[in-house]
Amino acid sequence: MSQFTHINASGEANMVDVSAKAETVREARAEAFVHMAPETLQLIVSGQHHKGDVFATARIAGIQAAKKTWDLIPLCHPLLLSKVEVQLEAIEAENKVRIESVCKLAGKTGVEMEALTAASVAALTIYDMCKAVQKDMVIGPVRLLEKTGGKSGHFKVEA
């Protein structure tokens, strides 16, 4: 197993020095799910939710969150993202919403945390907008699906 890159020889957490790393194109995809009652999902899908367009709000929240990842997670670097995409899909047969995020840049460090943050915050936004209707929604799983670029190469979750 690899060593933790954020821990120094004394066991202290530090931000990784990426100054000597080569810039490469890096991309990451993540997903999150929000499980809910059929009635709650129907309110979202039909556009009848009293707070407005849940998917549009969650999409914007996810994009905003990706851009703020460095501000939320202490050891993440501030990144100049070139792409953030958040897609939401109602899976009515399973009473859930699937969120997929994609983040991309040309840089010295990966965008996995940005993709995970985008998907997570989009899921939290759905919960926030729907909690008046249903409080027992479940968020999860949240996971990295794929990452490309950088020294560690290509990672993809097996289907």
Curated annotation (Swiss-Prot):
| Species of the source | Vibrio vulnificus (strain YJ016)
GO biological processes: Mo-molybdopterin cofactor biosynthetic process
**Annotated substrate binding sites:** L75, C76, H77, M113, E114
Name the keywords, alphabetized: Lyase, Molybdenum cofactor biosynthesis
One GO MF term, please?
Answer: cyclic pyranopterin monophosphate synthase activity
Metal-binding as a keyword? Answer: no
Pfam family name, one = MoaC
**UniProt cross-references to InterPro entries, sorted A to Z:** MoaC, MoaC_bact/euk, MoaC_sf, MoCo_biosynth_MoaA/MoaC, Mopterin_CF_biosynth-C_dom
Q: What is this protein called?
A: Cyclic pyranopterin monophosphate synthase
Q: Which Gene3D superfamilies match?
A: Molybdopterin cofactor biosynthesis C (MoaC) domain
Q: How does it assemble?
A: Homohexamer; trimer of dimers.
Reaction equation(s) it catalyzes = (8S)-3',8-cyclo-7,8-dihydroguanosine 5'-triphosphate = cyclic pyranopterin phosphate + diphosphate
Similarity-based family? Belongs to the MoaC family.
The EC number on file is 4.6.1.17
